[in-house]
Amino acid sequence: VRIRFLTSTPLDIRRGSGTYVGIAVLARALRELGHEIAIETPRVRLPVYTAERLLFNRGLKPSAGFDCTVGFDMDGYRIATEAGHIAALKGVIADEVRFERGLARLTMGIQARCERLHVLRAARVIATSRYCAAQVRSLYGVAREPLVVPELIDLARWRAALAAGRAPRSAGRFLVLFVGRLYRRKRVDVLLRAAVALRGRIPELEVRIVGNGPCAAPLRQLAAELKLHGTVTFLGDVSRSQLVEEYRAASVFCLPSVQEGFGIVLLEAMAAAKPIVASRAAAIPEVVPHATLVEPDGAEALARGIESLYRSPGNCAAQSQAGAARVEQFDAPRVARLFCEAIDR
């Protein structure tokens, strides 16, 4: 089958975050099943991401010579009336924008309007979680139920990378790892305030923050104001090999986000057999029901969740085993076959 992928998300792990990972792994898994995948991305890069996305969509030509066209998120909205066009949403922009402010809120609002047109025009809609599917119907007024195909992870490659890495460097430290783009909805500020509460309760605590984004500078400033030097380390964007090392070394993975359409980082943490502390919000409980889930936006609740794992090695081990078993259902070959079934309906 010849499949055309449309995406203006940067296919670069340093810029594209989870969306990049999901599309890249899906394309590779489909190729390994024998399908031909052509990925169209912007040829012109602009300093304003929304302008870049709009320009990319304006330049899209009708599909010719393909059995199927899949547009990710808002991409493909102008040609979505073509027969068999599929809108595949990694998240729901109209849901994400609720948590943003200022220019980010304005530009994401424009993207959300395009995404709404995309799902209303497409022949089929695929979402990554039941939560995401419900938001598509609620926020975009889609009458039909979207098909749900979860995010995926290439476990063979991931585990090979973990096995080939260096020995963990924790050296007696209790390392709490966050990975993600630094948007307001990720609530890294809550993690920083939790770190203040935990310093006296976990003397060997270190919080390591991987990722960049609009909130990077304000978060660094907040960490300085909270006097978290020596407790919190901002790593910025990292290479894939360094990312693997961060997961290997981590004692606990933490995702305090209040909005996730799925959360590929949760799959990465499970693949690395790490216990997880996360917010009981959006798609997170659906993806990691075995994790330590806490009420969102509460620094003390998050601190207690992290401390509970610190004080219970047995619980950590049990959660690690549960995650390592659960992540098998998201392995790339299996999910790629589910995706094929969805586009064939």
Mark where each language-model region is:
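Conserved donor-binding/catalytic core segment of Leloir-type glycosyltransferases
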Residues: P168-K186, L192-A195
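Conserved acidic donor-binding segment of nucleotide-sugar-dependent glycosyltransferases
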Residues: A291-E300, S308-P313
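Short alpha-helical donor nucleotide-sugar binding micro-motif in glycosyltransferases
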Residues: D237-V238, E245-A250
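Aromatic "clamp/platform" in nucleotide-sugar-dependent glycosyltransferases that forms part
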Residues: V258
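Membrane-proximal helix-turn-helix segments that form the acceptor-binding/catalytic region
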Residues: L106-V125
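Carbohydrate-associated surface elements
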Residues: Y131, L152
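Nucleotide-activated donor-binding/catalytic signature segment of Leloir-type glycosyltransferases, i.e.
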Residues: R220-V238
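Short hydrophobic beta-strand element within catalytic cores of glycosyltransferases
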Residues: P275-A278
